[in-house]
Each structure stands twice: as C-alpha cells, then as structure tokens.
C-alpha cells in the first residue's frame, strides 16, 4: 500500500518547481501525492519568507496541522511526519522547533534532496532533524528525473540565489549565492518535459538573467545562449524566463527578443521604485533612466513586447515626492500587469534596522493609489485585445464543465466555453470577445 504525501506550496514559482521535484524525489520511496491533507502520511509546507505575512501563514497552517494530528491520535492513527521546507526553514531554522515542537524536519531549499534520508530517520524515531546546508551543486546533481508531468506549460529551474543584496530582500540569505545549472542538465530536463507534451517552458531563477552555466567544451552560456539552444528543441513552441534584474539585461538578451519567435513578447522586469533616492537606498545598482533605457531598447527590438514589474511602497525614507516618482515611472512605461506590495521589514536585512520606517497607514494609502493606477493600465491593455485574434495555449480546466482556460503570449488568462477537452495542451487561434481586469473571454475561430 502506497504512502500519501501532501505538499502545500507558498510563494514564488521557484517553490512551485521545488515542490514538483520533491514529489519526484519521494515517489521511488513509495510516496504518492494527495490533495487531501487528512490522509497524508507526510505533510510538507514549502514556505516563503519574502514578507512577514507570508512567513506567519506557515505558523498558522502548522497550528491547523497540530489539531489534525490530535484528531489522528484520538482515532488511533499514527501521526503524519511534518516537514517545514523552503525559505522560512532556511531563515528561522531551530526557531521553528521552539515555536512548533511537533514539527519533525526543517530543511532548506538547497537541501531537500536529503529528504528521503531525513524521513527514514524520523521513521526510526529520531526527532527535530534539520538540514540548512548551502550546496547548490549537490542539490542539482541529486535532482531526480521528471516523473510528474507539469502539463502544457512547465517550469524549469536554471539559476538559484542572488548576489545583488537589495536591502529589502532575504533571498541572498535564504537561497544563497548565485549558482547556474549546467546547459546539459537544463537541456535534458527540457527534452523530458517536451516528450511529455509540454509546449511552453518557463526558465526560473531568483535572478535568471544572471545565468552563466557551463556548456559543451566548458563554454560558459549566457541566458541568451541557453534560450537559443533550447529554441532548437522540436515541438517546443514557447519560451519564457523569470525573474530578471535590470542590470543583467544584456545586449544579446535584448536583441534575442526581436529575433527568436519562440521567446514570448512578455517580460517581467521588476524595478521596485521610480525614485532614484529609493533605488539607491534599496541597493538596486541602477537608476530610473537606466531602466527607461532598457525598456526603450526592448521595444525597439520587439514593438509588441509587454512589460510587467514589481513595486514596493513605503520603503524606509520614502517621501511623497519619492512615491510620486514611482507613479510617474508607471505612467511612462505603461505596464500590462504588475505586482505591488507594502514594504515588509525582514529580519537580518539592512532595511529592517533603519530608523525612518514609514507608518502603516501611509504605506496602505500609497499602495491603494498605486494599485488603482496599475489596475487601470492592466484593464486598458486587456480591453485593447478585444476583437483581435490571439494564439492561446490551453492548459487547464475551468470551473464549469464545458470551460477551459489558456494563456495568451502576454500571460493573460483566456476563458472559452467548449466541451472539446482535446484542445487542452494545444495552441489555438482565439478571437477575444470580452475583457475584464484579470482575464479575457474568447471564441474559437
């Protein structure tokens, strides 16, 4: 009888990818995935530490799991093995055992390949096991072959960690220094997912355009080199990459957006702030004019490219003028979609110890204003698509029986009513008939 594995994933797409790999890792040891936490023999929380709210969600979920464990005990069942993985594990370590002593294993994002051994020790009644080593090579060398198919669109991790040390960010402390997988590893995994009917590959990294992986004859490949290499794979129709840092947008990568048809015309390029003063305080290593220059060059390379970004409001020392500079940048760039957040001080980062923290009510007010402008731009872009024909990759079922959902080249969700489920996994021409803030509606031509 197989054992059941339940994984709950928080945060970024890198965590989503890691969770798939954890499933692959544990499958040979008899663990099959379940979506029902109540039947799980192992419960893994793959966590995010980017903001305080995200971290506290982990502890709230652990509280619910404790109640579940008590219920199992009352029913005469063995308790599930509880694992906290990911960035909260890396950042808080032994503190997790102090706050939640019923947790069995704490494992960082670079160490989860050791989970089979750690789990076997818990089965032998060892307690409070922890592995927070930063050995990126070991992680990637020990990743299993792809077992669980991700579907029509697949994530592949090519780079981890970050050397930028932005003063608001915990990534260098939780994911470690920048490390790139070899071209051979990435290519082999790409071939595997395409053989399982993936049509789109999204290359992942905390700073993906800093990729410098070893290729044939020890040649170092840039991200542009890697994308060109992967574009040669038959039956692979779309390529994307995320998340990028402006200072690593090289000439060859920008030019590739104009020459490689498989590279989608949508780029997530976070700027965080439109104020030169705040950009400097954040240690972003560029100013607003540098960012504008990259945007202009991308649009020269490919006129139909659409941009996305991240913004943080209320960073320590942010004045009304600084916030107005951010609004000005947003209005000048005109984004297709964006993510925006209030600054959240993270322990151990330089921003957290500054004495000029912004009051919460001011951060909330600024976020509301910014999100209103971003929503206006997003809706305007979506409405501009009405009446056009777009190539949509259908990758999932909708809520209703005859509904399927796909993605445009610009990452917009498109809903159609069509009982023909054979369209799933295919790229189809769709005429867009209706636009909302977060989605489009269309009809098959």
UniProtKB/Swiss-Prot annotation:
Could you tell me which residue ranges the TRAM domain spans?
A: 383-445
**Gene3D superfamilies documented for this protein:** Methylthiotransferase, N-terminal domain, tm_1862 like domain
According to the entry, every stretch annotated as the MTTase N-terminal domain falls at: 3-124
Location within or outside the cell: Cytoplasm
Coarse class of the primary localization is cytoplasm
This protein's record includes keyword Ribosomal protein: no
The cross-references to Pfam families, in alphabetical order and at most eight, read:
Radical_SAM (PF04055), TRAM (PF01938), UPF0004 (PF00919)
- One Gene Ontology term, aspect cellular component: cytosol
Q: Which UniProt keywords apply?
A: 4Fe-4S, Cytoplasm, Iron, Iron-sulfur, Metal-binding, S-adenosyl-L-methionine, Transferase, tRNA processing
Q: Which family does it belong to?
A: Belongs to the methylthiotransferase family. MiaB subfamily.
Summary of the function given for this chain in its UniProt record: Catalyzes the methylthiolation of N6-(dimethylallyl)adenosine (i(6)A), leading to the formation of 2-methylthio-N6-(dimethylallyl)adenosine (ms(2)i(6)A) at position 37 in tRNAs that read codons beginning with uridine.
> What is this protein's record name?
tRNA-2-methylthio-N(6)-dimethylallyladenosine synthase
